[in-house]
Amino acid sequence: MAISDNNTGVHVLLISYPSQGHINPLLQLGKRLAAHPGVRCTLAVTRFVLAHSNTPSTGAVHVVAFSDGCDLRGYDEAGDEATFLARLESSGSATLDALLVAEAALGRPVRAVVYDSFLTWVPRVARRRGAACAAFFTQACAVNVAFAHAWAGRVELPVVEGTTGNKALLPGLPEAGLEPGDFPTFLTKPDGGCRAYLDLVLQQCRGFEEADHVLINSFYELEPKEAEYMASQWGAKTVGPTVPSAYLDNRLPDDVSYGFHLYTPMTAESKAWLDARPANSVVYVSFGSLATPSAHQMADVADGLRNSGKPFLWVVRASETPKLPQGFTDEVKGGRGLVVTWSPQLEVLAHPAVGCFVTHCGWNSTMEALGIGVPMIAMPQWSDQPTNAKYIQDFWRVGVKLRPDAEGVVRKEEVERCVREVMEGELSEEYRKNATSFSDKAKKAMSEGGSSDSNIVEFLAKIRLNE
């Protein structure tokens, strides 16, 4: 889709938190908005991200840069989370303000700013320049509801992890309740990680009250109770899945991939290897762009995959490859497995050879698997991932969750057991059927007149009317 230079109509600026998992969903929303007549979309990413991304392809969305105060080395330049977040607010506020002034001077004033919910300072800047603001929450509705209850003081922190029979029953969450270990780790271990990030995920809830609009990266049919609760409390609208159109409704020409890639995928190798495998035979394994499992854990995953007897494609980032058992990559390369440093995940999940996805349960990966219809084996690491894993196994029934031992390690026997259960167990067909059903619902939600599409249309209508 070519970029239009028409300055008339509505100009929407989208500004993202500087990580790949936050940038691409916002970009995909921008592509959806820009597909409507008379809408100009501009995505603002940090100077560091723009300088270090692999030739971004953003379709009809223009791209500009703002500063997070760490232009040369990104997060590493700050040294710690609190310093980084402080710089992000200080430099981000100043450069966003300058961007809004510059766009107005060019005759294309910004009517609305859609901001990542982590950037709680954006509404102050946007309103100063006469723009409406919409908070975009990249997490599941369920996770947002859990954070909102904690923010309001209805959940006492820490939620005690590891206990059973002590389920929390909270409005907007399943009637069956959540056990302590099902909550995001920021709530179960508020002092065990970074306090700055706990404050960040709770402070984002200000967006429910301060933003003119609240948009959620989910779809109604996936989380109806949670979505209805958010709509009743804050007027929130689901606008996802924010997955490229080629894997959903196919209404946006050439929208076949995300625009920003901080890693280079081994596309040719992955495709050639998958092409040589039978349908539904391959176990795809990826723990995302941030997870850092221990060498002990990596060894158990390796042994479990090997012992399952199933062919596997495993993404192990270059920084993590030293943790693999010595000689493992060469041992399996003959046909049983392929280890790559990064993969074109959407293409891999959509490949007929892939039978299941061993995932860290990051929300983007979860939405991709649901949108494409691939059963999952959940191995959550931190943040919102335990909640997503709970839904994968118990509420959506599209897979199983790996159970760690008392030391927190998922043993090789457990990896083998779960791979066999999802790939060939008595419930394997149910998992695949349920995954296919959610894929159909995701496609319908983003198709013309679907739940998410209708919410996007309604949002634009309100922006046009300055509501």
Where in this protein do the model-derived segments appear?
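Glycosyltransferase specificity loop/lid
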Residues: 1-467
